[in-house]
Amino acid sequence: MAAGGGGSCDPLAPAGVPCAFSPHSQAYFALASTDGHLRVWETANNRLHQEYVPSAHLSGTCTCLAWAPARLQAKESPQRKKRKSEAVGMSNQTDLLALGTAVGSILLYSTVKGELHSKLISGGHDNRVNCIQWHQDSGCLYSCSDDKHIVEWNVQTCKVKCKWKGDNSSVSSLCISPDGKMLLSAGRTIKLWVLETKEVYRHFTGHATPVSSLMFTTIRPPNESQPFDGITGLYFLSGAVHDRLLNVWQVRSENKEKSAVMSFTVTDEPVYIDLTLSENKEEPVKLAVVCRDGQVHLFEHILNGYCKKPLTSNCTIQIATPGKGKKSTPKPIPILAAGFCSDKMSLLLVYGSWFQPTIERVALNSREPHMCLVRDISNCWAPKVETAITKVRTPVMNSEAKVLVPGIPGHHAAIKPAPPQTEQVESKRKSGGNEVSIEERLGAMDIDTHKKGKEDLQTNSFPVLLTQGLESNDFEMLNKVLQTRNVNLIKKTVLRMPLHTIIPLLQELTKRLQGHPNSAVLMVQWLKCVLTVHASYLSTLPDLVPQLGTLYQLMESRVKTFQKLSHLHGKLILLITQVTASEKTKGATSPGQKAKLVYEEESSEEESDDEIADKDSEDNWDEDEEESESEKDEDVEEEDEDAEGKDEENGEDRDTASEKELNGDSDLDPENESEEE
């Protein structure tokens, strides 16, 4: 039982190549390479058995494949004979190979006929097919896709039997239970379905990344004393993309425990898994895991309850080339797939190149924790050329054959035999012949002989060049595109870039930002366009922070020093302007101007005369003050005397007035008196 590297759901991750051994006998090894070709190899003699190229192999590449189960024995009474059509259908199904494509269709290829058997399209998937599983009893198959649905197909009628939604996100892996009544499906979480009712029986936690492989590890539960319903107590294994842990789960009667009971740890992401089923509680499970780094890890463990610590491999297998000479060093050879043989004591290893793999049977030795096999595969990769490659091929004709050519009936043109290839063709021309020059020929053909100026590169070629440069790490090609200064050209190029090249482009821009300042200015324009145009795509990436962490730290460091640089820039401008102004005014003559105020310093003799004059002036000033005070006193005395005289006159007037009132005399006029009366 094996699970091949079907495909990664991450667009940025390198996709695994779908491959699988034929069931039971493992006589064939099917491999769908990246060029869209299906190749079937014989494992016994490492020979190519068949090769099939689908019509849409470039647009609809193969994403997963699965062999049909071995020949089924129908449970019928001996009196009833099997129909001829049923027998033919059963034998044909034995050698069918199901291929899932990136466009949602499923192809059934017959290895017996060497041609396409049928195609499953109508009512199926609308997106990439991630996994295919054949049912071992009913002659149907199940498929899951990125469109979130699971489809049950009838292989005989090529129609959909049932279709239901498997998850809120894409469904990446499937596995059918040993009794054929349950189905495991996984996106990030794992669900156990009842096939009869299409209802969820159990939920499991799953992995943080999309699950790439699912398989049951046991047929019977460890506790055989309790009644067995076909699923309770069984263990199954799951592996995920970018996850170095393989988790083991147990289906229990209660629905409380949803976490894994144990896990196996490997060195890298698993791309191919094969195991031997445990038929009783005392038989250990043997597990072979092929990692992306090209190593094979072998595990052997009895599944019996919970284990807290992750289990490490019992044996690790590597393959390397022999070092030729003292200076040459051995190079590792990647292992592509590994499967247990029927005796469970040996292993089939597929290593080398996907286009020309090498298949070898290796005996297992549990005593050695590490095995390194030295293999020379240089001869296997060399293409065999039987005939010389020539551009010109002459047809082989019989000397007695007659060749008919157009002409008048009855007249036969003489056919000269072709000259042998050993003769040399004369390359010298006859001198003195009247030969027309090339310029005259072009003039006669009315062709413009003037050379056209060098045209500018078209905009649509920039995305192609940039994509090729990022994939091949071509420095000259990247410089040709990234050193452009036209902002409109940069925007159009970024708009036409494929989505899977955005992260490599940002990483290349980050690398160039750390270089020369002149190139960093150009990279800032590219970076601005990428972040503005593809902001929605970047926000959907789950691992955006670790991928763009270097760019973020670089921007933060540049922003921190911006204020200091601006202050320094202002000071430098001030100093430079002052220096330039002083240099300009140094040589120029200033125009004549009159001083608004002139201060002259006096000598020491003048200062002494001034001091004497100041003293005299101070003495005179004191005398003047005394005289002014005496004059003020005299004036005050005179004013007092005048005031006393006036007071005396007023007193006399008052006395006379009072006497007149007493005597009845008044100073009123007669008219006034009459008025009073």
From Swiss-Prot:
<comment type="function">
    <text>Ribosome biogenesis factor that coordinates hyperactive transcription and ribogenesis. Part of the small subunit (SSU) processome, first precursor of the small eukaryotic ribosomal subunit. During the assembly of the SSU processome in the nucleolus, many ribosome biogenesis factors, an RNA chaperone and ribosomal proteins associate with the nascent pre-rRNA and work in concert to generate RNA folding, modifications, rearrangements and cleavage as well as targeted degradation of pre-ribosomal RNA by the RNA exosome. Involved in nucleolar processing of pre-18S ribosomal RNA.</text>
</comment>
<feature type="modified residue" description="Phosphothreonine">
    <location>
        <position position="656"/>
    </location>
</feature>
<feature type="modified residue" description="Phosphoserine">
    <location>
        <position position="658"/>
    </location>
</feature>
<keyword id="KW-0832">Ubl conjugation</keyword>
<dbReference type="GO" id="GO:0034243">
    <property type="term" value="P:regulation of transcription elongation by RNA polymerase II"/>
</dbReference>
<feature type="modified residue" description="Phosphoserine">
    <location>
        <position position="399"/>
    </location>
</feature>
<feature type="modified residue" description="Phosphoserine">
    <location>
        <position position="77"/>
    </location>
</feature>
<feature type="repeat" description="WD 3">
    <location>
        <begin position="124"/>
        <end position="163"/>
    </location>
</feature>
<feature type="cross-link" description="Glycyl lysine isopeptide (Lys-Gly) (interchain with G-Cter in SUMO1); alternate">
    <location>
        <position position="309"/>
    </location>
</feature>
<feature type="repeat" description="WD 6">
    <location>
        <begin position="267"/>
        <end position="309"/>
    </location>
</feature>
<feature type="compositionally biased region" description="Acidic residues">
    <location>
        <begin position="664"/>
        <end position="677"/>
    </location>
</feature>
<dbReference type="GO" id="GO:0042274">
    <property type="term" value="P:ribosomal small subunit biogenesis"/>
</dbReference>
<feature type="cross-link" description="Glycyl lysine isopeptide (Lys-Gly) (interchain with G-Cter in SUMO2); alternate">
    <location>
        <position position="309"/>
    </location>
</feature>
<dbReference type="InterPro" id="IPR001680">
    <property type="entry name" value="WD40_rpt"/>
</dbReference>
<dbReference type="InterPro" id="IPR015943">
    <property type="entry name" value="WD40/YVTN_repeat-like_dom_sf"/>
</dbReference>
<feature type="repeat" description="WD 2">
    <location>
        <begin position="57"/>
        <end position="119"/>
    </location>
</feature>
<dbReference type="GO" id="GO:0001650">
    <property type="term" value="C:fibrillar center"/>
</dbReference>
<keyword id="KW-0539">Nucleus</keyword>
<feature type="cross-link" description="Glycyl lysine isopeptide (Lys-Gly) (interchain with G-Cter in SUMO1); alternate">
    <location>
        <position position="384"/>
    </location>
</feature>
<feature type="region of interest" description="Disordered">
    <location>
        <begin position="414"/>
        <end position="445"/>
    </location>
</feature>
<comment type="similarity">
    <text>Belongs to the UTP5 family.</text>
</comment>
<dbReference type="GO" id="GO:0000462">
    <property type="term" value="P:maturation of SSU-rRNA from tricistronic rRNA transcript (SSU-rRNA, 5.8S rRNA, LSU-rRNA)"/>
</dbReference>
<feature type="modified residue" description="Phosphothreonine">
    <location>
        <position position="321"/>
    </location>
</feature>
<dbReference type="InterPro" id="IPR036322">
    <property type="entry name" value="WD40_repeat_dom_sf"/>
</dbReference>
<dbReference type="GO" id="GO:0003723">
    <property type="term" value="F:RNA binding"/>
</dbReference>
<feature type="modified residue" description="Phosphothreonine">
    <location>
        <position position="394"/>
    </location>
</feature>
<dbReference type="GO" id="GO:2000234">
    <property type="term" value="P:positive regulation of rRNA processing"/>
</dbReference>
<keyword id="KW-0853">WD repeat</keyword>
<protein>
    <recommendedName>
        <fullName>WD repeat-containing protein 43</fullName>
    </recommendedName>
</protein>
<feature type="modified residue" description="Phosphoserine">
    <location>
        <position position="431"/>
    </location>
</feature>
<feature type="compositionally biased region" description="Acidic residues">
    <location>
        <begin position="600"/>
        <end position="652"/>
    </location>
</feature>
<dbReference type="Pfam" id="PF04003">
    <property type="entry name" value="Utp12"/>
</dbReference>
<keyword id="KW-0597">Phosphoprotein</keyword>
<keyword id="KW-1017">Isopeptide bond</keyword>
<dbReference type="InterPro" id="IPR052414">
    <property type="entry name" value="U3_snoRNA-assoc_WDR"/>
</dbReference>
<keyword id="KW-0804">Transcription</keyword>
<feature type="repeat" description="WD 5">
    <location>
        <begin position="207"/>
        <end position="259"/>
    </location>
</feature>
<feature type="compositionally biased region" description="Basic and acidic residues">
    <location>
        <begin position="653"/>
        <end position="663"/>
    </location>
</feature>
<feature type="repeat" description="WD 4">
    <location>
        <begin position="166"/>
        <end position="205"/>
    </location>
</feature>
<dbReference type="GO" id="GO:0000785">
    <property type="term" value="C:chromatin"/>
</dbReference>
<dbReference type="GO" id="GO:0005654">
    <property type="term" value="C:nucleoplasm"/>
</dbReference>
<keyword id="KW-0698">rRNA processing</keyword>
